[in-house]
Regions:
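Patatin-like phospholipase
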Residues: 1-39, 47-215
């Protein structure tokens, strides 16, 4: 195990299709980090990595876009969001549980892996950044619901409600898509960060329309 370096997956929506190969390569090379952090799309990478499912790690952001239930305008008009979030997270995991399909999630392997997990969501009502760990994920549904909450892109997905609280994409929180501060608070000084943005990228300030929508 790699105990002195935190593995951090940056969020980034479908840009995570490029970093899915990194997840698979880490698993293929037996690089087992003891602490794994992720936000938004990085939360999906986090749980796939901890479950040690190489094929699912690759397929989650590549093959899945071919799923007829993936989303689109029809899904948006039906109230499911442009990305059919419930189907993509809890739906697929529960429908394929116990099968040998590529997108089946091995929750037993996830629990058996001793690696610590840290993902974050953004409380839409309070503006609070909320962190979840394995203790908040006793079932696969609990886990997938939190991954979905961390990945809920405003305007593209309906808000995710957990215990009466409304959550949106964790990238809107204090970590800005990279759980570096959380890893530092956990005592880490060395980090293996899987980026979805090029080196030197700086997010531009929101324009007038987004500011009006999210104020």
């Amino acid at each position: 195990n790699i105990d002195d370096v935190a593995l951090i997956f940056e969020g980034g929506g479908m840009r995570a299709s490029y970093t899915a190969g990194v997840v698979a390569t880490l698993l293929e090379r037996g690089m087992d980090f003891s602490h794994v952090y992720g936000i938004s799309a990085g939360a999906s990478h986090t749980v796939n990595y901890v479950s040690r499912n190489i094929e699912r790690s690759r397929a989650s952001f590549t093959d899945l876009v071919c799923d007829p239930e993936f989303g689109g305008v029809g899904s948006l008009l039906a109230g499911r969001g442009f990305f059919n979030a419930h189907h993509l997270y809890e739906g697929i995991a529960e429908d394929l549980a116990g099968t040998d399909e590529i997108m089946a999630f091995d929750f037993d392997a996830f629990l058996a892996n001793k690696a610590e997990v840290h993902i974050e969501g953004f409380d839409w009502d309070t503006g609070e950044t909320v962190a979840w760990t394995k203790t908040d994920m006793p079932t696969m549904r609990d886990m997938m619901l939190r991954v979905r909450a961390s990945s809920t892109m405003p305007l593209f997905m309906p808000p995710t409600v957990i215990d009466g609280r409304t959550f949106m994409d964790g990238g809107m929180g204090t970590s800005w898509g990279i759980c570096l501060d959380a890893a530092r608070r956990d005592g880490f000084e060395r980090f293996f960060i899987v980026r979805t943005q090029p080196r030197g990228y700086r997010k531009k300030p929101l324009g007038a329309l987004p500011r009006a929508v999210f104020r």
